[in-house]
Design a protein with these regions (language model features):
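N-terminal beta1-alpha1 ligand-phosphate binding loop
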Residues: 1-9
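Glycine-rich beta-strand-to-loop/alpha-helix junction loops that act as flexible
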Residues: 2, 13, 17, 56-58
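A short beta-strand-loop structural module common to alpha/beta enzyme folds
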Residues: 10-24
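Anionic-ligand binding patches
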Residues: 26-158
C-alpha cells in the first residue's frame, strides 16, 4: 500500500496501526468483509489525527455453491468521506472450502494445505492458487488504487 501512496500522493506520511476489524476472525460474505474494512478505517481515523486512513479486510463468500476469497477496502477522510472498493475474487478448492465452511479460519487451513507457515502474511491464498502470479499484496494494492482514484476524482487538486 505504501508504494502506491508514494506514487500517487504528495509527500505522504505513514502511520501503521493495528486496529481491530470488530467482525469475525474469518469474515464471511461481502457485507461482513466490507464492515471489517469500514471499522478499521474509522478506528484508524479516530486514533490518529490523519487526513485519510485506509481499512483493508479479506474474507470469503459463497457464490453459486462455491466459496470464493473476497477482499474490501475503505478510505476514510478526516472530513468523514468514505470511499469503498472491492478486489479480485477467486474460487477456493473444495477441500479448503469445506474446512472454512466448518468454521476454520482460511489462514490456518492454507498452512495445512500448503505445509507452509505465514501464508496470510506473504503470498496469501490468492498467491497459492495463482502460482504467485497475483499475490495478496497485489490484490490490496489494486484496492488502494481504486480508493485513491475515487478520492482524486472528488479532490482533483490533491
Amino acid at each position: 500500500m505504501q508504494s502506491i501512496c508514494l506514487q500517487l500522493l504528495k509527500d505522504p506520511v505513514f502511520i501503521s496501526l493495528d486496529v481491530q476489524s470488530n467482525v469475525s476472525e474469518q469474515p464471511f460474505g461481502d457485507e461482513e468483509t466490507l464492515q471489517g474494512a469500514l471499522n478499521r478505517a474509522k478506528q484508524a481515523c479516530k486514533e490518529e489525527q490523519v487526513h485519510m486512513a485506509f481499512g483493508l479486510e479479506g474474507g470469503v463468500k459463497e457464490l453459486n455453491g462455491q466459496l470464493f476469497i473476497c477482499n474490501w477496502g475503505v478510505l476514510q477522510t478526516e472530513a468523514g468521506e468514505q470511499y469503498l472498493a472491492g478486489g479480485a475474487q477467486l474460487p477456493l478448492p473444495r477441500e479448503v472450502a469445506l474446512a472454512v465452511r466448518s468454521g476454520e479460519e482460511l489462514g490456518p487451513v492454507m498452512e495445512r494445505y500448503t505445509n507452509q507457515t505465514g501464508i496470510r502474511h506473504n503470498e496469501g491464498a490468492v498467491g497459492v492458487f495463482t502460482s504467485n502470479i497475483v499475490k495478496r499484496a497485489d490484490m490490496f494494492e489494486h484496492i488502494v488504487k481504486l480508493l485513491l482514484g475515487q478520492y482524486f476524482k472528488d479532490h482533483p487538486n490533491c
